[in-house]
Amino acid sequence: MSPDRLMIARRYLDDARSLLLAGRLESAVSRAYYAAYQAMWAALGNPPKGEQWRHIGINSHFVRGRWFEPAYPQTGPGLLEHLRFSLHRLYQFRVDADYDLTPINTKSAEECVRTAERTIAEIEQRV
């Protein structure tokens, strides 16, 4: 567990909320994504030596739940399976906003902020 990364994740989440309120929806989505990403990294710790956390891969490792239940099997559904789809959507919205320059609507931006909030809350419950 990395308290510094979790602190950064919370800060990014605050930024996402502020951007959402200001109507800067694409930026809110991007900050929400990185809030969740940094929170997952905080929970998982650093990747194995010589590797790095890939954006889609970190979701799978996080959802598996072995970061808080190390004896949990490596196959079958993860302990945080209820977050998998939302995290994938958050990633896709971020790609849409940052790379494809797709306009994001308020409902989608709110969904992204909620996903980041839920991700951080799941971690805070377990640390």
Map each language-model feature to its residues:
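Terminal alpha-helical segments
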Residues: 1-127
